[in-house]
Amino acid sequence: PSMDVGINEITGRFGIDLNPINVMDENEVDWLRALVWPERQDESEILECAVTKAKEHKDEIKLFKGEMLDVLPKIFSDLVTSTNVCVFDSHVMNQIPNEDRQTLSNMLKNLSSQINIFHVSVGGQSNPPEIRLSRYCEGRRYSELLGYSDAHGRWSRWVI
């Protein structure tokens, strides 16, 4: 099927993390800052912009603490079936066991019997990391390679 479904209004933003960072807590933000390599000044600037944006929009984003495979069904159960859902991950899938990635794909297939799901994944196990769009519709998955990305987000090369 066509990947073109028009542009929809964003009705909710959700995040899942084993240990979500509270951007209102400077100690937690300092921990994030410590992860940026000292010679990567541009990445420090991007992080500061991201923290500022997260603070500005803190009430618009619902963060869940836990395992992705445990939390996603709960989030989906609260959504209206006429909603299109976009699941986005960036450089996470390479840290998840193969069987959990397959479980996620099967879960999204099953959930797509009630709701259209778009999964944009950056990273994974390819080198260079792929940017991939998977559309889940009526229990089936359709996948398309969009491009490649640097592991630190310094560049993207589109193939579409």
Model-based region annotation:
Residues G66-V71:
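Conserved SAM/SAH-binding loop
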Residues V85-N98:
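A short SAM/SAH-binding and catalytic strip from SAM-dependent methyltransferases
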Residues I96-L145:
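C-terminal substrate-binding/active-site "lid" region of AdoMet-derived donor-dependent transferases
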Residues C137-I160:
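SAM/dcSAM-binding transferase cores
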Residues P73-C86:
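A short acidic, Gly/Pro-enriched loop at the edge of an enzyme's catalytic core
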Residues P1-K65, D78-V80:
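Class I S-adenosyl-L-methionine-dependent methyltransferase module
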Residues I7-E9, D59-I61, K65, Q95, ...:
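C-terminal His-loop and adjacent cap/lid subdomain of alpha/beta-hydrolase
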